[in-house]
A protein has these predicted regions:
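Beta-propeller folds
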Residues: 1-227
Length: 227
């Protein structure tokens, strides 16, 4: 993944697929001019890294929380959210049903001036859980399941059942202030996209109703939270 200014490249290694479009990987930052290669983070595999418009920051998701790395400060890493929890709350990446329905794997953007982060949060605490059996298989072989099958449990909303509750949030990188954005949406509605614009005071959030027959686009100020 090339930075917008062309000075750096994010290189993924040890990639592990999560769902159809999502994956975890150990990312490295390659600096083109110096040919220097550095780990993006030492805290564990990352998901959905995004560059700031000036190429000086990278935001990513780990364990359902958002982290920020500042290249100008020795790749210093800070944690943005702390409420992420497996099978309960997801920040910055879609849950299974949103990824599958709307074909995306990242719900995290910078504003145009790189001063703020905005993302979608998925509260799946009330979604019912489903378990799959895992067998040895092939390509890849899961040797730990060669004798006895393992299990994989995740939140799987069937038709008519409760979906994740979605909301949009912003983070001021300088003040560390987190705010919920004011987006009109029914409790069972969707936010299938969050998009930055050339205006640092505007991001665009798409919303849909549960039946997916009404699409609205909201221009939101991430500082005032008003749409």
């Amino acid at each position: 993944i090339m930075s917008p200014d062309g000075r750096h490249i994010l290189i993924s290694t040890k990639r592990q697929n999560v769902y159809r479009r999502s994956y975890k990987a150990v990312f490295y930052i390659y600096t083109v001019q110096s040919r220097k290669l550095e780990r993006l983070s030492d805290g564990g595999p990352q998901q959905a890294p995004v560059w700031s418009p000036d190429g000086n920051q990278v935001a990513f998701v780990r364990d359902n929380n958002i982290f920020l790395v500042k290249l100008l400060y020795g790749n210093s890493e800070s944690q943005v959210t702390k409420d992420g929890k497996i099978n309960e709350v997801i920040n910055g990446i879609p849950d299974w049903v949103n990824e599958e329905e709307f074909g995306f794997n990242s719900a995290l953007v910078f504003t145009a001036d790189g001063s703020m982060l905005c993302w979608i949060k998925y509260d799946e605490s009330k979604v019912k859980q489903y378990s799959l059996q895992l067998f040895k298989g092939r390509s890849p072989e899961l040797t730990e399941n060669a004798i006895y099958p393992g299990t994989y449990s995740y939140k799987y909303p069937k038709a008519g059942e409760e979906n994740s509750r979605v909301s949009a949030w912003s983070y001021d990188i300088k003040s560390h202030r987190i705010q919920q954005l004011n987006i009109p949406l029914a409790t069972d509605g969707y936010m299938p996209r969050i998009v930055s614009t050339v205006d640092p005071d505007k991001i665009v959030i798409y919303t849909m109703n549960r039946h997916q027959d009404v699409l609205n686009l909201y221009s939101v100020n991430p500082r005032s939270t008003i749409s």
